[in-house]
A protein has these predicted regions:
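N-terminal secretory signal peptides that target proteins for export/translocation
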Residues: 1-3
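Bacterial N-terminal signal peptides
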Residues: 6-16
């Protein structure tokens, strides 16, 4: 099915200088798509400039030509081959193929450059309850130009985790780096024959973040201080501390955190009912999660961590790191070079948040007052 929607074209940005790094203040997008999304859960730019967008609420993956406004669908909703339910992340593979995270069907699917489904494989690489350790769950965080998948294993506890590179062609897993994890809050309900265990980090957790470059380098964004290290095949580069004024957590920031968690938080549910183990994956708050959490009953930090969990490496090799800002303030991004230094900054218009960086520019999601999402592209070259 093909649909046509208008895209309007304009371009505007303001350039200023800040402490050794050029700052771009984006004002108007080069392209804003008129199509209304219920949500934008996954995004990627194709080699010909078209883009793919996964809307997990509407159960659709759209292929969009921003130059003409032409939109068609990739696959369709359902449980069968080439179908998906609650489509989520989209990642580039060689020959313009795409890896789709299919949360509702608990699997990942590969579509070739023409949009044809090629294969699917499960998110859980093992069976729940089959061994003493946690089930290996693969939620991709990035891919490189060779098609290797990078992920951070879920579960296991402790204050550190691993960045793992999965080379499917060689059937090999390699640990690329170790990262700091926040403590988890565990809640258990039910009886011995029907037990439900839920784990979640505290509000605004202090933890490392990371992103993958097309050439396979991994940017490690370190906490509690703020610096960027690079891990590559030829060695590691340790960056210098980057100044980060504290952002106090007040009532508005608490409300912001709860809203973002309800809309975008990833839930993994493993239930054991009389020996029958099942797993569910979902994005956002589920209907069976119970009453809304009481913000006053939660332990809040005095300030946000220096950076959020949003980061991306563009085709030019620069890392984009989303800085923490006050609630309802414009989002700000540090551009980090190969030595771990800040080489530029970008400030987005209010209500915009980065979803990807490609050869054509930087892509942002705009959510309006009614919760409708729009896709915008800005020229930041």
């Amino acid at each position: 099915m093909t649909r046509m929607f208008a895209a309007w074209l304009a371009a505007s940005l303001a350039v200023t200088a800040t402490a050794g790094a050029q700052e771009l203040r984006l004002t108007k997008p080069a392209v804003r798509l008129a199509h209304q999304f219920s949500g934008i859960n996954g995004f990627r730019e194709l080699s010909d400039g078209r883009v793919l967008v996964a809307d997990g609420i509407d159960d659709v993956v759209l292929r969009i030509d921003l130059a003409t406004g032409k939109i068609d669908t990739l696959g369709r909703a359902g449980p069968g081959p080439g179908e998906y339910k609650s489509p989520d992340g989209l990642f580039a593979l060689p020959n313009d193929a795409t890896l789709l995270v299919d949360l509702g069907n608990a699997r990942m699917s590969v579509f070739d450059g023409t949009g044809k489904h090629r294969e699917s494989f499960p998110i859980a690489q093992g069976q729940p309850g089959a061994g003493p350790g946690p089930v290996p769950l693969i939620f991709p965080r990035g891919t490189d130009s060779r098609g290797r998948i990078y992920f951070q294993p879920v579960g296991g506890g402790g204050d550190s985790g691993s960045v793992v590179r999965w080379d499917r062609a060689a059937a090999r897993f390699d640990t690329v780096a170790k990262v700091k994890l926040p403590p988890l809050i565990t809640r258990t309900s039910g009886g011995p024959n029907s037990r439900n265990v839920r784990q979640q980090p505290p509000p605004y957790p202090v933890q490392d973040n990371w992103a993958v470059a097309p050439d396979g380098r991994v940017a490690l964004i370190r906490a509690p201080g703020y610096r960027v290290d690079w891990a590559a095949a030829g060695g590691r580069t340790t960056g210098k501390l980057i100044p980060a004024p504290p952002v106090p957590v007040r009532a508005a920031e608490k409300k912001e955190f709860m809203a973002e968690s309800a809309a975008n938080g990833l839930s993994v549910s493993i239930e054991n009912n009389n020996g029958q183990v099942s797993m569910r994956f979902a994005r956002g708050r589920r209907d069976d999660d119970g009453d809304e959490p009481d913000t006053e009953g939660m332990e809040w930090p005095a300030a946000k961590p220096p950076f959020t969990g949003t980061s991306a490496v563009g085709p030019d090799g620069r890392l984009w790191v989303e800085r923490s800002v006050a609630a309802n303030a414009p989002r700000s991004y540090d551009l980090i070079g190969p030595a771990g230094d800040v080489v530029g900054r970008v400030v987005a218009p209010v209500g915009r948040r980065l979803i990807g960086v490609g050869a054509k520019g930087a892509y942002f999601r705009h959510v309006d007052a009614d919760g409708i999402s729009y896709l915008e592209r800005y020229d930041v070259r």
